[in-house]
Amino acid sequence: MAQDSKILEELYTVIASRKGTDPDKSYTAKLFARGRGKIAQKFGEEAVETVVAALSEGKDELVGESADTLYHLLVLWADCGVEPAKVWAELARRTGTSGIDEKKSRAKK
């Protein structure tokens, strides 16, 4: 795998390829087999662990937890059929817009 910004796309491709494969041979396949609720739960758990690492642990722990969080986010995207390019396009659309202005522009629910 690449050591640059393409790593997320490459990892996403590997993750997506695990969908429907033997859950006894792949942690990713096991997550897919357990369903979206479990995938979302794991993402949430990793996000919390990342916050804890940022607040009370060292940089190495934060890096590790961040990698876990990104991995589980990619699994969630793959399960939902969201490709990274869609997220990158949304980020690009928001580039150059203040966060305050961008938030105001969203439709109220």
From Swiss-Prot:
Instruction: Tell whether Nucleotide-binding is among the UniProt keywords.
Output: yes
- Top-level division of the source organism's lineage: Bacteria
* GO CC, alphabetical: cytoplasm
| EC number annotated for this UniProt entry | 3.6.1.31
Q: Which reaction does it catalyse?
A: 1-(5-phospho-beta-D-ribosyl)-ATP + H2O = 1-(5-phospho-beta-D-ribosyl)-5'-AMP + diphosphate + H(+)
One Gene Ontology molecular-function label: phosphoribosyl-ATP diphosphatase activity
Pathway, per UniProt?
A: Amino-acid biosynthesis; L-histidine biosynthesis; L-histidine from 5-phospho-alpha-D-ribose 1-diphosphate: step 2/9
One of the GO biological process terms: L-histidine biosynthetic process
Where does the UniProt entry say this protein principally localizes? cytoplasm
Matching entries from Gene3D superfamilies are given as: MazG-like
* Record's subcellular location: Cytoplasm
Matching entries from InterPro entries are given as: HisE, PRib-ATP_PPHydrolase-like
Keywords of this entry: Amino-acid biosynthesis, ATP-binding, Cytoplasm, Histidine biosynthesis, Hydrolase, Nucleotide-binding
Annotated family: Belongs to the PRA-PH family.
Q: What is this protein called?
A: Phosphoribosyl-ATP pyrophosphatase
Q: What is the gene name?
A: hisE
